[in-house]
């Protein structure tokens, strides 16, 4: 319960800081998710636009009898720099380096999630063996690990909320969120 309260307080703090850092004004370039699709509106030619494509990786682990033991799905953004008001080589290189650092962070994060799948797979196989697969005969029963993303962006910041759902055979799945903010000029 203390961890949940601490996470909630962190999310509120990130939200307040984001509002303060953006000066509580309408940004020149706003990006939001609309119907699970990123929408970008640029209202000033002086703002470089960083566009985002989504990549999703899915994993499935099955028993020899084709019973699905574990499914995993991880969604991460892949940022690309699509415009630049300043064509100097140094500024363009700095922005590109920032975008690369952000992309590397998300790739590393996803790889850490995938690394934990080995442990989940071992747990699922052990339970399957112990129970004779009885629980897996229930419709849609399988261990599950998923992470999706919602985000907000202006000309200076990219704020991301990672939403996790993990199920390992208990009464209900575990859910939690992690908020991360990136400075678009430094990554």
Spans of features found by a protein language model:
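Positively charged n-region of N-terminal signal peptides that target proteins for export
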Residues: 1-6
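C-terminal motif of bacterial Sec signal peptides marking the signal peptidase cleavage site
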Residues: 19-23
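Sec-dependent N-terminal signal peptides
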Residues: 7-13
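Short helix-loop boundary/capping segments
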Residues: 177-187
């Amino acid at each position: 319960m203390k961890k949940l309260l601490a996470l909630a307080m962190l999310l509120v703090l990130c939200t307040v800081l984001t509002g303060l850092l953006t000066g509580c004004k309408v940004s020149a370039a706003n990006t939001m998710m609309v119907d699970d699709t990123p929408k970008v509106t640029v209202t000033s030619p002086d703002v470089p636009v960083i566009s985002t494509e989504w990549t999703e990786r899915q994993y499935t682990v099955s028993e020899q009898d084709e019973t699905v033991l574990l499914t995993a799905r991880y969604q991460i953004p892949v940022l690309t720099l699509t415009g630049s008001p300043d064509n100097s080589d140094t500024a363009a290189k700095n922005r590109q380096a920032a975008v690369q650092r952000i992309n590397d962070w998300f790739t590393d994060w996803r790889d850490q999630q995938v690394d934990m799948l080995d442990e989940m797979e071992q747990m699922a196989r052990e339970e399957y063996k112990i129970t004779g697969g009885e629980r897996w005969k229930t419709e849609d029963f399988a261990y599950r690990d998923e992470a999706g993303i919602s985000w907000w962006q202006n000309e200076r910041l990219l704020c991301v909320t990672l939403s996790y759902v993990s199920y390992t055979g208990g009464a209900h799945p575990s859910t939690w969120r992690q908020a991360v903010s990136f400075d678009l000029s430094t990554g």
